[in-house]
Amino acid sequence: MTMLKLALFFLVVSLIAGLFGFTGISAASAGIAKILFVIFLIVFVVLLVMALAAGKAIL
């Protein structure tokens, strides 16, 4: 699975667990989703800076 699919999976798991009131599972899944979000954000910024430094078209 790609990291994006894992992030979406943990988001869905945390929402479902939240509906059923399993706060431990919900908090753990939400925590993993937050960590994956930060990782994706850092990778995006690094790649954006690299593309701008290389002078290549981004989109």
UniProtKB/Swiss-Prot annotation:
First-listed, main subcellular location of the protein, grouped into a coarse class: membrane
UniProt membrane topology term: Multi-pass membrane protein
GO cellular component, one term: plasma membrane
Entry similarity comment: Belongs to the UPF0391 family.
Keywords: Cell membrane, Membrane, Transmembrane, Transmembrane helix
NCBIfam families from the UniProt entry: PRK13682.2-5 (NF010234)
Cellular compartments annotated: Cell membrane
Species of the source: Granulibacter bethesdensis (strain ATCC BAA-1260 / CGDNIH1)
Record's keyword annotation contains Hydrolase: no
TM helices/strands, residue ranges: 6-26, 35-55
UniProt protein name: UPF0391 membrane protein GbCGDNIH1_2123
Tree of life domain: Bacteria
